[in-house]
Amino acid sequence: IFSPVGDAMRIEISRQESSELCRQYGIPVPAFHHVQNRLEARKLMQDDPRPYVLKNPICSPFSPIHAIVCESVTDTLGWIERVDYAEGLFLQEYLGKEEAGHFVFISGGEISSLVTNQEFKRAFTGDMGPLAGAPLAGIVEQDPDDKYGLAKELIHPLKPWFKKTGYTGPLQVTAIRKNGVWHAIEYNIRLGVTTTALLLRMLKNPVDVLLEVVRNQTPVLEWHAEKYFGCTLTLAGYGYPYVVPSVPKLPVEVSVPLECDLWWNEVDEEGGQLYMANHKNYEMGHRIADVNACAPVMDSAVKLIENEIRKLRCLGSYYRLDLKELAAKYSSLLTSEKAALR
């Protein structure tokens, strides 16, 4: 895994430590609380009633809790009665939907901005349905100059901590804007499934850059101007992301070769035929493939993906139909932010 090691990993692993670190260095964060059981959660809601996002305290794919976004106090009161408290519960104030992310490499004593992005984890078109474990769609924009100020506001203040821990590797901050102020809601120490494939396409020298970061050297970034924007769209398998009864080995068909990148996820091959992976002891729908495209302008990347993903077929599969609308919202959000910085 391409990430920092040792104490530098704590910024992702422990949500409470991450939030406290931000407060120490003057980075805005939502109100947050860590409780151990249902009684403590009930008491918290009496003392400080707000809508909260419910999360696992220790960031792990094997935790019994995955993020539940509560948009009202009533939502929160309902969910604190249902979650599994085996690892406790982290409650983070819900700040709204104006969300964006920014990636950097920290290497050679320098912070090098890479891309600004948005990820869309709601399962269905229109941002409806449950949060999936990984994004169903994503947008990435080259941003080595940090033109929206996300790195300046939410990453650069942590320089003393990076030096103290010997942090070397990638870092993503996910932030939500409320009342004109960006708040850090999460840090990730990996490039991530959505952004990595697009970022490496955007760079002219991806292998050289990765090797420079591994060696703790300042990376020399060279960008493809014609790949300024990138988009990704996931073909999700039968039942995803719900728990469903076991399904048969469903064939995955590609009518004609795609004219953009196709990344297979959970598929099996037998006799030259692809099938949606059938996990006999893991009864979940599965992510079949990601379709990625880069272009000089956002609209071109979106149009290419929408055309190409139609070439894939698997019974009961689906993908989000609102990538064009998501791209427009992304542009609107960050255009207003850029204007505010002038």
Residue ranges, per PLM feature:
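Short, well-ordered beta-strand elements within core beta-sheets of diverse protein domains
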Residues: 137-140, 231-235, 287-295
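Glycine-rich phosphate-binding loop of ATP-grasp-fold ATP-dependent ligases
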Residues: 31-32, 52-79, 96-103, 122-145, ...
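Short, conserved charged micro-motifs
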Residues: 41-43, 74-78, 146-149, 240-245, ...
